[in-house]
Structure formats: structure tokens, C-alpha cells
């Protein structure tokens, strides 16, 4: 029993498998058929769209041709509006024509139906006569201009040359001369220009004389100002000492004055006078302190840059040494009163002399950029390496223990 049931189940299963296989094949065929139908539908739709586009273009061309034919003339439109005969016209059945051929035929009929034609622009006799008259007038004007330009040129050539003028006149009349040459000279304007030139000459001569007088006055006033700045010099019997720096400067520029030793004193009732000696450097341009205070600087020689006071130049001031070393002042040595040190202060100053000497020596070393002699080693023997490498404090502590 069990085997029969199993066999039946197997037969049913085989039949079912056959049915399923057949259905699958049918479904595949149906799908292929659907795809082919969809493709045909797409082709038909594409043809329909193209046909609609063609029909639209044909309609547009027909409408254009109708508009052209209607806009030709009112007479042709009135004739066309007449009622046509009732009899039907039998049109011959021929081959179908394209829209282009129809448009060409309609354009030909429209061109034949036109009664008025636009006149092309052409040159008439009146226009040519006006052109010839204008050309004659222009040629006559050009000839008259040429003649008028030749006349002033001849007058300029025949005009006598003026006498030579001074530089001040030439500078004064530069603008007027340029304007006279640029403009065209007429016979009425020539007399005016000659009068203006004479007036300008007289005015320039007056101006030149005035400027010369002003220059002489200014030079004399300047000389008077500069002459007032002189100082009392030494008597003529005094000997003049010439320094080498003064010689070198005088060879370069001869305007540098000779060094003069100045003296200042106050006469008493008996006629005796006191002379104060002032320290004078080698520079001959500034022999005393009062000179730079009272000197008048000329505007031509003064420059906008202030000289360097600390610069090493031959014309440095006497104030360079002030403030650099201890105890230096601007007063001369003759006015300084040296006090003699007392016996009590000698012992105090003796102890401080060594420290001052060391300070002065170090300062001179720094100023002269040389090392002091105290840096020199006392012996040339090299120290032992044992003392260098070992710690002295630890060694001493061990030795004490």
C-alpha cells in the first residue's frame, strides 16, 4: 500500500512539473509578444508625430502665401471678392505637388497681379548741377585761402629783422613771440603787433634796470651785514701760525680765512689790559667759541642737514670734548682755581688713586679698542691636568679626615 501511494505521488509530481514548464514557456512567449507590440506602437507614434509636424509646416507655408497674396493691392482683393459662377470647375486630377511648388506658383501669380512698381533711386540732372556748383565753390574757396596765406608769408619775408635784444627781453617776450608766430597776421593786426613789441621792449628795459638796481642794493646790504660780523684781530706785528690742516683746506678752497688768535680785554685808567688765552684747535674756520655763536650764516651755504657734532671732520666744534671725560667743562683753564689738598685728605686720596688709575686705564682701553696689559699671563707654563680634572674641595676634605 505504501509503495502504491508513493508511485501515485511521483506521477502527480511529474505532471505538475510538466505543467509548470509549459506555463513558463508560454509566459516567455507572451513577454516577447508584448515587447514587439510596444515597439510597433512606438514606431506608429513616431510616424504620427512626424506627419503632424509636416502638416503643420505645410499649413504655415500656405498661410504665408495667402498673406502675401492678400497684401498685394486693393484692386486685386476687390476682384477676388466677386461671386464666382455656380458652375463647378472640374480640376484635372494630376500628381500631388509639394508645398514648395505651390508657394512658387502663388508668388508668380502675385508678381503678375501687381500694377504699381517701386521706382529705383537714380541720379537726376538737378542733383548733378548742384554737385557741380558746390565743387566749383569749394575750389574757389581753396584758391582764395591759398592766396590769403601767401600774402602774409610774403609780408613776413619782406619784414625787416629787429636789432639784437638782451637776454632779459628775450625771456620776458617768449610767450608773446610764440603767440605771434602761431596766429595768422592780417594787415590791420601788423601795426598793433609792432606797437606792442615796442612797448614790450621799453617795459623790459625798464624792468631790467630796476632788477639791476635791486640786485646791487641787495648785494651791498648783504656785504654790510657780513662786514658787521668781524671781530677784533691781533695787532699787525703779531706772528701768524699756519697749521698743516689749514694749508690743506686752503689749497682746496681759497675762501677759507687764515687762523687769527683773538684777544679780549678791558682797558683801565693806567692803560693796562688783561689778555685771556683761549684754547684754539687746528681748525682755521672756527678760531674761538664766540665765532659760531655770533656768525651770520648765508642762505646759499646753509644746508638743511645739521652737521654731526661727534664726526671726525677738520671743522669740528670745541664742544666735542665736553662730557666725554670726567672733570671736563666748557670754561677755559685760566678761570679754574686749583685748590691744594690738605694734609688730612692726602691719606684718603692716596687709597683711591689706585682704583681711579685702574678705572682710567680700563676706560682708555675701551676708547682705544686695545686690551689692557693686566690680561697678560704671568707664566707660560701650562697648569697640570690633575688639578683641573679633580675637585679640590673634595680632595681637601678627604685629606683632613
From Swiss-Prot:
Q: Compositional bias (Polar residues) at which positions?
A: 348-377
**In what ranges is there compositional bias, type Acidic residues?**
171-183
From start to end residue, where is composition biased (Basic and acidic residues)? 98-108
Tell me where in this chain the PTM Phosphothreonine is found.
Answer: 331
The keyword Cell division belongs to this UniProt entry's keyword annotation: yes
Substitution effect: residue 377 to H: In mei-S332-4; induces missegregation of chromatids during meiosis
Task of the protein = Plays a central role in chromosome cohesion during meiosis and mitosis by preventing premature dissociation of cohesin complex from centromeres after prophase, when most of cohesin complex dissociates from chromosomes arms. May act by protecting or Rad21 from cleavage by Sse/separase. Required during meiosis in both males and females.
Query: Under what name is this protein listed?
Result: Shugoshin
Q: Which species is this record about?
A: Drosophila melanogaster (Fruit fly)
Encoding gene per record = mei-S332
